[in-house]
Amino acid sequence: MSHSDYFNYKPYGDSTEKPSSSKMRQSSSSSSSRLRSESLGRNSNTTQARVASSPISPGLHSTQYFRSPNAVYSPGESPLNTVQLFNRLPGIPQGQFFHQNAISGSSSSSARSSRRPSNIGLPLPKNPQQSLPKLSTQPVPVHKKVEASKTESEIIKKPAPVNSNQDPLLTTPTLVISPELASLNTTNTSIMSTPQNITNQTSNKHIPTRSQPNGSTSSSTLQDIVTTNSSQRSVGHHGGSTTSLRTYKKQYVLNEQLYLRKMRNRANDDYYTRGIVASSNFEDDEENFSNKGEDDLELEMDDLLKVEGEDKDNDFNFGYNFITSSTKNNENVVSMSLNYLKGKLDWLRDVNNDQPCEIEDEEWHSILGSEDLLSKLLQNPMVNNRFEWQTMLSKVLKGDIVRNEKTKIANQGKGPGFNTQFSDDIWIELKAWMNGRTVEDQNKSLRIFRDSTDSVFQEIMAFKLEDNMSADEAAETIKSLVDKYYRVLNLWPNIKRMHAEKPITKTEAFRNRIDTLNSWLNFKFNFDTNIAYLKKWIVGNKELESTTEVDNTTVNLDDPAVFATNCKRFAEQIMKEKDIELIFQKKIFFPLAPWILKAKFFFLKYQKTWNELNLSYLDQDLEFLLMFPMRLVKDIILIRLSYAKKIQNPTLMMIDQMMDDFSTYIKLAVQMKFTVASYCNDWFFKVKIDPEFDHTVVEGLEYFFSILELRILYSGKNSFKTSKEPDLLLKYWEMFRNVGYYIDDAGELIAAEFTKLTLRLVHRLHAYLLRQQNTPPKLENEAAAEKWLVQIFEILGSMKRKLNRFTNILTKAFQNFVRYKIEDHNYLLKQLKETGHFLIYTGGYLEQNGTYLIGSPELLGCKDDDILRIIKNSDIGCDLVPKLEINNSLTIYNALDDNWNSNSSLGSDISNDGTPFYYIKNDLTTQPRSYNGNRVNREPDFENSRSTEEEFYELETRLNSLGYVLVLTPQEPLLWEGEMYNLSDNKTIKPEGLNLKVIPNSIDLMCQGSSYALEYQCDRFQQISGSSVSFLEKKSSSETVKNNLQRINKAYFRCTYSVLKNYTKIVTTFKKVSPVNDLLNNIFLFGRDFGLNFLRINVANNEKRSIIILLMMRLSIGWLKFLAEDCDPTDQRVFRWCVTSMEFAMHMVSGWNILALDECQFSSLKQKISECMSLLISHFDIIGARSIEVEKINQQARSNLDLEDVFDDDMMLQVNSEFRVQSIMELEERIKRNPHQTGKVIDDSDKGNKYLVSLASSISNVSMRWQKRNFIGGGTFGRVYSAVDLDNGEILAVKEINIQDSKSMQKIFPLIKEEMSVLEILNHPNIVSYYGVEVHRDKVNIFMEYCEGGSLAALLEHGRIEDEMVTQVYTLQLLEGLAYLHESGIVHRDVKPENILLDFNGVIKYVDFGAAKKIANNGTRLASMNKIENADGEHEDVTHVSDSKAVKNNENALLDMMGTPMYMAPESITGSTTKGKLGADDVWSLGCVVLEMITGRRPWANLDNEWAIMYHVAAGHTPQFPTKDEVSSAGMKFLERCLIQNPSKRASAVELLMDPWIVQIREIAFGDDSSSTDTEERE
């Protein structure tokens, strides 16, 4: 097939003759207007051979293979990219792109101008009209070669769209083009608009030549398809000529290539596409960067310290005590240490050698070494001069004048029956009537039977089960006896009469026996029922096999191995659901809660009777019901872990999803273990918890922290995108801090991970600061400089403040260890013995090393595990009374422990979202509690909460019950005379098991339980020990946690040091661009506050604190210098700044700090203070003289204020408030209950199952491991959810179609099959991708591409799109997708804004093909795809076949009339036999959508109902067109072409792509690419 044949192939019977070969091979010097393509390959013969083998689709992006329109994308390739339009105006660089949010809909401030669709990367020139090309004068641009497409290995794997190419009936011949053409760019389409535009406009120099295989040289470009005779190639403006269709198709193919190429070259959103890579080690780049230059910092510190023997390099010796005093005043905060001050007194010797006060070396060293240093310094006159000046400054600044002026400035910003016998008679008469007797006979019969009942009562009193009787046998025996009792009971009208006649039945022993037997039978029946229900639930959720059916009733779940296998499969199945907590509540906790509660209640109440009857306890059944959810959640965690660990470099979106999953699973696991452990207390019943359960939860925690680290540290290393990282840490700290109390080995893990993450955040903050100081960004103007400076202030201030708060929380939570020095060994041992302490013998391992453990009296008689928990720091970080927030029916399990009394009972209700729940009610005072979502809340008026006194009593009781362990390391031999406790042989403690570094002659106190009890335990121990010990330090007993906290303190110091030391770099950088004094003054204010916060909050030794104080003193001098030299003295603001700066300087040089300044610094300080005082005096308003004069002037010039605007503002606020309240009420009314359908085993006799098997056997049936997320909306016949693919973490959309019965399946099956068949063959960026189908017994899931941006209808709810260029871009994408559909033989038939979605890049996607139909070659609708075999093996047609050329009857016409009336074409409503071109009805619908985008109103918005709309459309009317102010004339003509009544005259989608209005936006989008291509090829 020749190249010309590709462009003259006529799939719809075009009778136009093909151009001759000679015309297709014109020379490059031809003067005709031509379209130019890239070279057609190196070997044309090979290319032609490939072309002959199979047709390919327009828009194919690779030249390596060829596909039809239903070809599959490469795995992982994103089907759509953002349209990036760039400006072509002179003076603007090519390829310059605006930010996605840079498009402003209009200059107005309405909500309509801030809509989402504008975020598509469209750059707007300052004058859009000048940027548009003139259609009649533009030369034909050329294009460049298409770059090689990415290989499949370079693309992130993603579920590939499923396309069916095997069924010949489903394959539609489409426009066939050459393989080389499939990857070409398009040309400027403006030349195709009018006949006069197709002229000789391209010179020969734009047409490069290439060598042909035969050695000849010719022009092998797409311009060869255009003949020299322009009249033969004329294109009517509305596509009226015969040849125009062919030309449109050719141009459509060319334009499609460039369009698809632009889609693929989009800039992806990092949230969905960027893989987050974990750091290879803990010392990440941020820490390394912040450590860069540490040597320089230490050298500076050496120069500042001048203290010998100071260990400055030890991270773990940076201020041991984490106690932050809350009583520090400002004076004490800024006091330097005496040792540091000694190193700063050299100025006394070097100040002036001529003065007689010079000090000799020997005298100087004697002064510094003396104990009365301060008194000797006061004898020096120069020191006295400084203190005198300091006193004078303090008096001035604290005087009345300055205080009054400050008050004035501060105030400037402030503004101004029947009786018993009668009822018995009725009962007797009814009884006689029912038995056909007289009343007398009935009375006689009852007396005889009543006299014979004594034997039954005696049997009950003597009843006792035999030993070793099985539960089933016992149930039969008990049931027989109980049935006798109830038959006897019917002989009396009520129990009260029976008690009166038979006193034995009134005894407590008899009633207890009856109650116990009834309860036992009820428990046996309900336990068996619930166990069978759970097993059926497990087996019933197997996925439907596509070929065979499995009888799930034959599965033996009593076999533990079989049950474990099915349980794992079941866990994997329910993991797909979006809300695991809700599933556990509805399916497990709610049905089991009352019976589990009653099981414990009745046993404790009737335990004595239980033993008398020799009843066996149903402990195995109860254990199964308790342990089943724990086993299930364990399997869920393990399965989720296996999937999560397979994902390499997850995106931020995947990380968020996994964090939500694992936090939910861990929370459920902890709640269930706590509930089971509490339930088993106080009675004989015990369960054995899986020893691997805790390990699984810890493993889940470890992975959670690994992805939390990625989530917090994901952003670029140059800046912080948000300051939410500490908030995220605080959120999960509140969630997990008590987990260590319930899960073994979790406490220390949580503590270590939180401190590690906090440390890394502080390092990142320091690294960010250093980057801004040393390598600031290029600031082009004053606005950029101001934005940069404000960003630094916000990030440093906000992050430091939040991190400080979180660090303080961690520090207090992890302080569980205090170290004392032993002063009197013998007295200490004596006191410990007398107060009941005991020696804990660990097996000799610790004792051989000189370390001994001594327990407090509270621990005597405790379990070994309790002591080991103290040693292992298991409860580190927990609350004093650890509690869990349980918002489900697990709270009912242990209701006996929560204010249960004789008046208590269970009540049930259903929440607003359909979730059932139980609550405890008291018959005397109760009202039902409300249920809000998954949270149970008591109404405040009826809440039986404990008083404050009771809560304090609980805390006090808990505190008194806690003990402590002393780790004693004496220098002397230990002779213990008190009590001793031996640990079990398997519980011995070895030195390496003691996570503590001991030092000789010390005693370490490790408290039990929460770290918040440490203060209380320390006070107790110090009262016991007296003066025999002295305090050394308080810290965490975990070495890892302690070291991390020490490193955090050092990181805070280094960050503060950098702020104060290098503030001049920030000032210099800012002053180069903007000399705004207000912002420069804020730099000094920020430095002051940053330093003071460190001194008040953070921990450091005295020498390090002194360094910060000295730097702050230098900062104060620099601040005063700035005010005196750079600021305008007449500015009122400078007065306020001077007062603040001098007060800061006075505060910093107070006390002995003033001696740390050298003479030069002190002189500069005095000079700048004098200048600032002069400035203050010029602003002083003595006795108000100046203010009175200014007030007189202001009164003369003051005008009356119009308060009308104020009232108008108040009215608008009230209206807005009412509108919001109304919206909230409407939203609450729309909340519906979500019923749940229970699956059934498939039945061969059910006709509906044939449909399921047909769908399951489809080639697009996939086996995908996924998990449901949020509800999105409803489609034509299903509900749509977002979901995550567990194999790769990608987000999908899942249309869930519920199947009620066979009739509903027969009704919706054709629609499902039709939509699947349509989606399988489609593959285009503007059509939602289809990934496959998953078939179950009660529902069908269809997997499709997820569109994050929502629907176009939701977008238009905010108003019209005021920017016409944005409307053009959307229309272009809509036409591209519609043209592809029609070229593939698909008619959508329901085009409307609700079926048009936008992905996360704002690109249009067609969706919901439930109403679409596929047209075969002969123009008839395909029906074979909707045939299935019935029960007799014959084919049954489940759809109606209609001819597109003639409608046979009204029934078929009504079936073809599908869509939404306000968007339906006239021929669709009237059932006209004149259908016009293929897809003409879609074009009408498209015009209605464009009309709505322009006007913001739905078509026919002025009509009341759909019948009126259909009447007007059928009558030949058209919707109301927009005004001239809303759209240009070109856009108006485009709408006219779309909304032509006659479908034969209505333009097709391909023709509309050549409309000037669309050509205009295409020219702006792709014009520059064409011109740049020409330059590259000529080079």
From Swiss-Prot:
Location of Phosphoserine modifications: 57, 62, 78, 118, 290, 1424
Signal peptide span: none
Bias type Low complexity, positions: 21-44, 104-118
InterPro entries: Kinase-like_dom_sf, MAP_kinase_kinase_kinase, MAPKKK_Ssk2/Ssk22, Prot_kinase_dom, Protein_kinase_ATP_BS, Ser/Thr_kinase_AS
Protein's UniProt keywords contain Transferase: yes
EC nos: 2.7.11.25
Function: Kinase involved in a signal transduction pathway that is activated by changes in the osmolarity of the extracellular environment. Activates the PBS2 MAP kinase kinase by phosphorylation.
Protein name: MAP kinase kinase kinase SSK2
Source species of the chain: Saccharomyces cerevisiae (strain ATCC 204508 / S288c)
